[in-house]
Amino acid sequence: MSKKTVANLSAADLAGKRVLVRVDFNVPLDDQGKITDDTRIRAALPTIQDLTSKGAKVILSSHFGRPKGETFAERVKDKFRLTPVAARLSELLGKPVPKPNDCIGEEVKAQVAAMQNGDVLLLENVRFHPGEEANTPEFAQELASVADLYVNDAFGTAHRAHASTEGVTRYLRPSVAGYLIEKELQYLQSAIENPQRPLAAIVGGSKVSSKIGVIETLLEKVDKLLLGGGMIFTFYKARGLNVGKSLVEEDKLELARTLEAKAKERGVALLLPTDVVVADAFAADANAQTVSVESIPDGWMGLDIGPDAVKTFQEALSDCKTVIWNGPMGVFEFDKFAVGTEAIAHSLAGLTGKGASTIIGGGDSVAAVEKVGVAEQMSHISTGGGASLELLEGKELPGIVALDDA
């Protein structure tokens, strides 16, 4: 999936041109409407600054939250407006970033017409229009009508065929990838298609069902697969072990057996924890004890991997040249059950220091490495949750397929 990028566009290609840039500014806000984490805004800066430095007029579009309703009028709510984002972006860029009250229409056309080379405009939330997620040609064409070319830098929504990620490419050429998408493809694709070996994947999270595709694909590619999180109890139950009150997906027991058999057949080392930390309730202050997976007591539930499992996992990872991590080892929101996840985060930081490529594949693992304070020590932290998983599953992402081939 080699695509043209912003780097392929010169100042001559861009000077005075109106560039529609799809970004992912879906940042978290607190109760006062203040941004609590501006990572996604900062992640888009290299693309924005490259375009403005080449004299382009940059028109940004993003979704924000999930406005509900059949019509525009029902969807428009102040809490879904991009106002705080425009303010933060203007601080980061050191210049005003105006924001119209809509993403299409006369006000937008007038503001775009008034733009000077190097100016930045942030359109209002594209999801105020039902045509965005429905990817209607009318809405896509209207959105594209104010621009000359298109850049997609929103990896987090690249797996969705929406008007602002896929529809607009039918009306704007060239359509290229921004630096963020380029980096995501470079790391995630090469990790799967052309990795330095040994290649290990660590997959956690509470449900096997949400990770089936990724586990099946990884079994075809990796040398070692380490499983943690709530999903491991489905595997234990499939082996005939008592799992107490631990989370189990009864309809996935046969699948768990199939996956274990497939790993054996392919010569992949599939590692499940040998001990777990169990609790008498799902709570931060629950009573906890460490037990072997063969002796989980009735009425108790597993909420983290145990110290022996951590040691085994660390040993298995010690010689790996590439490691992909997706999903926590336990309920890391509760400090008492965050030990396994934190230990793995520290191990990966150590491996990066030894020259290994460490890739955090989106979702909760990102929050985990940030909580531990080792985010800076990872080779790559993916900004997409579902998009990262789908790419690791080998699926084509509509928002990327639609861009010009290199």
From Swiss-Prot:
Organism lineage: Bacteria, Bacillati, Cyanobacteriota, Cyanophyceae, Gomontiellales
Keywords per UniProt: ATP-binding, Cytoplasm, Glycolysis, Kinase, Nucleotide-binding, Transferase
Pathway of action: Carbohydrate degradation; glycolysis; pyruvate from D-glyceraldehyde 3-phosphate: step 2/5
Subcellular localization(s) per the UniProt record: Cytoplasm
Name of the protein described by the UniProt record: Phosphoglycerate kinase
InterPro entries per record: Phosphoglycerate_kinase, Phosphoglycerate_kinase_CS, Phosphoglycerate_kinase_N, Phosphoglycerate_kinase_sf
Gene transcribed to yield this protein: pgk
Binding site for ATP: 211, 302, 333, 362-365
SUPFAM superfamilies membership: Phosphoglycerate kinase (SSF53748)
Pfam (any one): PGK
Reaction(s) this enzyme catalyzes, per UniProt: (2R)-3-phosphoglycerate + ATP = (2R)-3-phospho-glyceroyl phosphate + ADP
Organism: Cyanothece sp. (strain PCC 7425 / ATCC 29141)
UniProt family annotation: Belongs to the phosphoglycerate kinase family.
Gene3D superfamilies per the UniProt record, alphabetical: Phosphoglycerate kinase, N-terminal domain
PANTHER family registered for this protein in UniProt: PHOSPHOGLYCERATE KINASE (PTHR11406), PHOSPHOGLYCERATE KINASE 1, CHLOROPLASTIC-RELATED (PTHR11406:SF23)
